Regions:
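Structural signature of FAD isoalloxazine-binding scaffolds in flavoprotein oxidoreductases
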Residues: 22-39, 85-115, 129-136
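A generic local secondary-structure boundary/capping motif
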Residues: 20-21, 59-62, 70-74, 87-94, ...
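Anion-binding (especially nucleotide phosphate/pyrophosphate-binding) glycine-rich loop
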Residues: 1-80, 84
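Residues embedded in well-ordered beta-strands within globular domains across many folds
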Residues: 41, 71, 103, 243-244
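Short, basic and Ser/Thr-rich N-terminal targeting/leader segments
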Residues: 8, 15-17, 98, 167-168, ...
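Phosphate/pyrophosphate- and phosphate-bearing ligand-binding catalytic cores of soluble enzymes
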Residues: 21, 105-249
């Protein structure tokens, strides 16, 4: 399907779990969902995952073999493909820290890319910049006692649940600005509870916009734009969205 659309020069979008993705209510045309492309193989201290595997499933496979590295990332609700695209991270760790090789589809050709030809930065990657379709990735981990691995993952989950809203959301709305959380600026402007239609700034964590009921993609877009404008006016900085917008909103 990707090869066909590429040959026809038609635009298409790749989705995993749709984490951190705002999709137009009017539709977006050609979408390919890869969340069912699954498979995990452990080879010594390396774990090979296909793009549709969730970070939770990869963590569990690693834990089963006493491999450490994915504890901090285990609560990220996205797939491996999506995590690699945006270099997902949490608690000081990023998926790019562990990648040794990825297999991608690009220009209708399947190719393996070694670590020396990869780069990852804060919520960005060569995958995103070049439009690679990730098929699988190899992650190098380290051996550790299983009880210590599980304890760290549990601690991260406890912190996450205490800090983040339970209501439906797209995850963190904005990236950090010069290492300062966007939530700091939003909270400083007393914008918790600020809303547009069914979209509302979480009262639990200012970095999240939640769906309080019936929110549309337009509600979300208008609210996030308003937040950006207010922060720009007050602090003179431009907040960059962490979420990806697909379609016309």
């Amino acid at each position: 399907a990707v090869e066909y659309l590429t040959e026809k020069n038609e635009k298409f979008f790749i989705l995993g779990n749709g984490t951190n993705t705002l999709i137009s209510d009017d539709g977006v045309g050609n979408v390919m969902c890869l969340k069912r492309v699954k498979g995990i193989e452990v080879r010594g201290e390396e774990i090979v995952g296909r793009c549709g595997e969730t970070m939770k499933s990869l963590y569990r496979a690693a834990l089963d073999k006493g491999l450490s590295g994915l504890e901090e990332l285990s609560g990220i609700p996205g797939t491996l493909g999506g995590a690699l695209t945006m270099n997902a991270g949490a608690f000081g760790a990023e998926i790019g820290d562990y990648v040794t090789e990825i297999t991608v589809l690009h220009g209708g050709i399947v190719q393996k890319i070694q670590k020396s030809d990869l780069w990852f930065s804060y919520r960005d990657s060569v995958v995103k910049k070049k439009g690679y379709v990730v098929l699988s990735a190899t992650l190098r981990l380290k051996r550790k006692e299983k009880n210590l691995i599980a304890a760290r993952a549990k601690d991260c989950e406890t912190i996450r649940r205490a800090a983040q809203p339970d209501s439906p959301s797209l995850g963190s709305t904005f990236k950090k600005h010069d290492l300062v959380s966007a939530a700091y600026y939003i909270d400083a402007l007393n914008l918790k509870g600020f809303s547009e239609g069914g979209a509302k700034v979480s009262e639990k964590h200012a970095g999240f916009i939640i769906n309080s009921g019936g929110a549309t993609s337009r509600d979300y877009k208008i609210l996030s734009d308003a937040i950006s404008d207010k922060v720009k006016c007050a602090f003179g900085i431009n907040l960059e969205r962490e979420i990806e917008i697909i379609g016309n909103i």
